[in-house]
């Protein structure tokens, strides 16, 4: 029986994916094997020694201490793409609403309550909110992952010309992307073409201020920008300067701040991107499936600190080893399995940056004594026998 601790409210649809005969799920477990979390801050949390995995029901993991988890052999999962449709729909909605000045027009209309000349004033006042259709306009998409590719495909269906930039596009994302999306190998080449620009990349030290004074200077005059990924991707000071100069005519974002609230041409929503019951269910289901498969079978899917490794069972017992990505590890591991007289049926080894994961199915004396010897290898962090 594995114990799972839930932090925050996790959708019952997701929890139902955890077999009650194998998983004891509780908010009170003191020393869990796994943690399911949404937004709870774990950065200063002391983890119990037997904690094996943390699954975040969402994409961002800035509330989880990744380096410390790696050092302790804790696999951290997220759920990329589970909320993709929710975010993509909102982006498309705000693209249209922002282009037609709907937010400002709707707010102005509220002031007409009990106006005896409402019909006349509506016809007179609507001129100040005239906007543009998006059909035939050009959209630039920075980041073509689960969300960016959906936005690009939807924009194509709406009759837009779409350019995409993503030097790290995955094979799956590329397969799902419309062939009508123009792929740019250089961001600077894409920016001058775009009437609208939307960004869909994770927040990392290397992506902070992706939209800055230099990139904005390359944009077409009057460009409208949408940011439904992370607030830090856009340099606020540079954005405000560009709006003051007329370079940027509109900014729609899910990340309000004092610096941008109340500014003309800026529309802020209260982090609505993934806030749908469907997205919460999808995230919870994916997180539960990831943590279940890892605890039961050692398979790793959508981990942010360990490599992607999954392998069908081949009989015997399964040995799972988290270790540092160093030369000679395989020879040290197989030397011990040979010494123990094991027959290896299947074996896989993959790495991710400075971390690696070796998983093998073997028949023979797979026991605690062997696990102790494997754990004694200097670069080994954790050993599990399943």
For the regions a language model picked out, list residue spans one by one.
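Glycine-rich Rossmann-fold phosphate-binding loop(s) that bind the pyrophosphate
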Residues: 144-145
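A conserved regulatory-domain signal marking ACT and ACT-like small-molecule sensing domains
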Residues: 301, 305-386
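An N-terminal-biased, well-structured beta-alpha scaffold segment characteristic
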Residues: 1-79, 192, 212-214, 218, ...
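Rossmann-like dinucleotide-binding domain for NAD(H)/NADP(H)
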Residues: 213, 221-313, 357, 372, ...
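N-terminal Rossmann-fold NAD(P) dinucleotide-binding loop
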Residues: 148-149
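Rossmann-like adenosine-cofactor binding region
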Residues: 43-45, 167-259, 275
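Phosphate-binding beta-alpha-beta segment of Rossmann-like dinucleotide-binding domains, i.e.
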Residues: 80-138, 172, 302-304
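Oxidoreductase and adenylate-handling cofactor-binding alpha/beta cores
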Residues: 88-107, 153-160, 285-299, 334-338, ...
């Amino acid at each position: 029986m594995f114990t799972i601790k839930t932090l925050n409210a996790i959708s019952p649809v997701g929890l139902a994916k955890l077999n009650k005969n194998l998983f004891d799920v509780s908010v009170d477990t003191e020393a869990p094997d796994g943690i399911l979390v949404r937004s709870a801050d774990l950065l200063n949390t002391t983890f119990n020694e037997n904690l094996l995995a943390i699954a975040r029901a969402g994409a961002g993991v800035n509330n989880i201490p990744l380096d410390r988890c790696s050092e302790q052999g804790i696999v951290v999962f997220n759920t990329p793409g589970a909320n993709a449709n929710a975010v993509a729909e909102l982006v498309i909605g705000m693209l249209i609403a922002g282009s037609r000045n709907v937010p400002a027009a709707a707010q102005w209309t509220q002031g007409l309550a009990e106006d005896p000349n409402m019909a006349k004033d509506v016809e007179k006042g609507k001129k100040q909110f005239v906007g543009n259709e998006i059909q035939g306009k050009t959209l630039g998409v920075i980041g073509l992952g689960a969300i960016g590719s959906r936005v690009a495909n939807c924009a194509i269906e709406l009759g837009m010309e779409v350019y995409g930039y993503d030097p790290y596009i995955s094979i799956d994302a590329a397969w799902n992307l419309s062939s009508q999306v123009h792929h740019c190998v250089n961001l600077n080449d894409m920016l001058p073409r775009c009437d609208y620009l939307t960004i869909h990349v994770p927040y990392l030290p290397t992506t902070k201020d992706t939209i800055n004074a230099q990139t904005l200077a390359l944009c077409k005059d009057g460009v409208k920008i949408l940011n439904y990924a992370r607030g830090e991707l856009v340099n606020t000071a540079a954005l405000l300067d560009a709006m003051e100069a007329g370079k940027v005519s509109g900014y729609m974002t899910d990340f309000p701040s004092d610096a941008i609230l109340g500014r003309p041409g800026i529309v802020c929503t209260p982090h609505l991107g993934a806030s749908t019951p469907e997205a919460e269910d999808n995230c919870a289901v994916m997180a539960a499936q990831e943590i279940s498969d890892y605890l039961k079978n050692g398979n790793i899917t959508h981990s942010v600190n360990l490599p992607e490794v999954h392998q069908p069972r081949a009989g015997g017992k399964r040995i799972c080893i988290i270790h540092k990505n160093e030369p000679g590890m395989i020879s040290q591991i197989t030397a011990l399995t040979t010494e123990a007289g094991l027959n290896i049926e299947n074996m896989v080894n993959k790495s991710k940056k400075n971390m690696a994961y070796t998983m093998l199915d073997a028949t023979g004396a797979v026991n605690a004594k062997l696990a102790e010897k494997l754990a004694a290898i200097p670069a080994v962090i954790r050993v599990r026998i399943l």
